[in-house]
């Protein structure tokens, strides 16, 4: 008895071969965006360096927050040389790597730009504001790293997207898992980065780990 399934399959294959027909995979939204941007994928770039370079750098560079803040307040250049980084071009401020440990004294969790304020020196007053997302302001993690720089990117748009990708990565890896209730009075330990704040303003820490 003839095998009609095989015969039909061969006939279809023959038609496809003769007509030059081929099946093309539909790209995902991310793949389509990457193709449209010439292969630039900031989220993938951040993921590839996060464990191997970013975490080890922050762990090595970060000082105790109270020490970093005290030195930055009296001598920003000295604090920057020891704990910080800034782009050589332009007038970018220092961004410092710090290890913050303390007690949460205030929590704002209703906003998308949620944060907690932390007392790091046990005086009952807030010393730093820690962003807990999902919306994270600034690009402190990118700006604290001495192994990435603007000249490696095509333009300011790519550089900005790269900075935002760090925030997206941190949010998915760490911040989404944090509880949102009953935070006041809890202890917090975090390593991250923050730009030199304006006088009288709290340091705004972006968590790295």
Predicted regions and their residues:
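Sec-dependent bacterial lipoprotein signal peptides
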Residues: 1-21
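OB-fold and OB-like single-stranded nucleic-acid-recognition modules
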Residues: 5, 20-209
